Amino acid sequence: MAFPPNSWRPTGPLPTSSLSLRWRVMMLAMSMVALVVVLMAVAVYAVVSRALYDDLDNQLHSRARLLIESGSLAADPGKAIEGTAYSDVNAMLVIPGRSIYTANQQGQTLPLGEPEKDVISGELLMSLRTANHQRVLAVHLANGSSLLISKSLAPTVQVLRRLGTVLLIVGGIGVAVAAIAGGAVARAGLRPVGRLTEAAERVARTDDLRPIPVVGSDELARLTEAFNMMLRALAESRERQARLVSDAGHELRTPLTSLRTNVELLMAAQEPGAPPLPEDEMAGLRADVIAQIEELSTLVGDLVDLTREDAGGITPEPVDMADVIDRSLERVRRRRNDIEFDVDVIGWQVFGDAQGLGRAVLNLLDNAAKWSPPGGRVGVRLHQVDHMHAEIVVSDQGPGIPPEERRLVFERFYRSDAARAMPGSGLGLAIVQQVVLKHGGALRIDETVPGGNPPGASVHMLLPGQRIPDPGATRSAEGFVDDRGGHTVATE
């Protein structure tokens, strides 16, 4: 059975784990506590067991030493061995070739194995071992006799069993307390994470970009603040996108409507039986169509450049701003060969987006050329401000920009009343500002001739970078080197 392309799609998020993070934290706490409890229990059991066995061995050694040093074994061995029956030990005295004396507790028999036989035969001086649930000590005496003493391990085993029970209960309580504490800590610690999760789900479900309240100053508070920064950036991006779409639609509607009207007139004039239009009107319509197509092309190009700058992801590279100015001047000069350019530039390198910087400089020059009268002059200067910054100044002899509009001209699609009669999309200076700010620079607008009539406009573009070593030389727009040390060069 064949499935159509793209017929299968996941219906929801894939599960990441069978256990929630809270349960995993609690299980981790339980596991760590259980491991510590087991290690401590084993250590305590081993230490106590060793201590009990050492105490039992010391008791056997003390009892044997007491019997030997008292002399009762030599004086009356039978009575001395019988006396041990009233204590808690089993005893045996072996006198080779004569007799064996024994005294056992009720229900017990002193074990006699190979180690004890080796002591009796004199092959070993002493042996100590565990046999038949008893601790057995055998000592070979100086007179050739052998003394054997044993004691039941039942009391010791009972103490160790009780100790194991206590350790098990205490360990279980510790693990349970650790589970409860781990759950409480996980619940309290993951509460901000839960708020972040709810916020993310709310954003995905409703597009609600309200920030989350930040509580405290710990790592989770920093995570919340970072998430809020992401929400603010997303809100700004959506606002810019909506504004761009709205403004672009508005700006495209006018030239498209005019273009459609002109095309319909041209088509109607070509229909059979239609009255012919005068040639001058036909030429005017065709010129209008071409102008409107060029306006649309410019607007679409500006929109592409603007969205390109918004998208980012551009690999920076060293850019020689003098070369950028040279190339931009060549393009502007082809469009406006009726004005002169006074160029005074130095070698200055900026680490950034070559295409974006070129577009910014070209827009400044285009704007200055657009507002300059025929035969006017446009000044282009690139000079060093300090050891880290240089400034590009583009000056024209146009009507200037009123102070109240100098901030607005960098807004997208903003066009003053005077600018609406001129070609353009209202995006040129917005692109300039976006490029300059992305490179860590700044923009300002002054009058070319303060108080003049017309005052003109000078746009100052400050860019960080470094000087390109070229002592005693200034580059012109034509690419030659002027050895006069930075004099103004006029090009046409």
Swiss-Prot record:
Organism field: Mycolicibacterium smegmatis (strain ATCC 700084 / mc(2)155) (Mycobacterium smegmatis)
GO molecular function: ATP binding; phosphoprotein phosphatase activity; phosphorelay sensor kinase activity
Keyword set, alphabetical order: ATP-binding, Cell membrane, Hydrolase, Kinase, Magnesium, Manganese, Membrane, Nucleotide-binding, Phosphoprotein, Protein phosphatase, Stress response, Transferase, Transmembrane, Transmembrane helix, Two-component regulatory system, Virulence
Region feature (Disordered): 470-492
Reaction catalyzed: ATP + protein L-histidine = ADP + protein N-phospho-L-histidine
Transmembrane segments: 28-48, 166-186
GO CC annotations, alphabetized: plasma membrane
Topology feature Cytoplasmic, residues: 1-27, 187-492
Highest taxon, organism lineage: Bacteria
Name listed for the protein in its UniProt record: Signal transduction histidine-protein kinase/phosphatase MprB
